[in-house]
């Protein structure tokens, strides 16, 4: 899925070393 540039830059590195976009993370948590 293509993520808009502003959101694409908002990535966080998970403890297991993966990078996950904040947008995806919010969807999983919600």
Swiss-Prot record:
Keywords: ATP-binding, Hydrogen ion transport, Ion transport, Nucleotide-binding, Translocase, Transport. The keyword Methyltransferase does not apply. GO terms for molecular function: ATP binding. GO terms for biological process: proton transmembrane transport. Its EC number is 7.1.2.2. It catalyses: ATP + H2O + 4 H(+)(in) = ADP + phosphate + 5 H(+)(out). The keyword Aminoacyl-tRNA synthetase does not apply. It is an enzyme of class 7 (translocase). Catalytic subunit of the peripheral V1 complex of vacuolar ATPase. V-ATPase vacuolar ATPase is responsible for acidifying a variety of intracellular compartments in eukaryotic cells. V-ATPase is a heteromultimeric enzyme composed of a peripheral catalytic V1 complex (main components: subunits A, B, C, D, E, and F) attached to an integral membrane V0 proton pore complex (main component: the proteolipid protein). Two separate genes encode the catalytic 70 kDa V-ATPase subunit in psilotum and equisetum. Belongs to the ATPase alpha/beta chains family. This is V-type proton ATPase catalytic subunit A isoform 2. The lineage of its organism: Eukaryota, Viridiplantae, Streptophyta, Embryophyta, Tracheophyta.
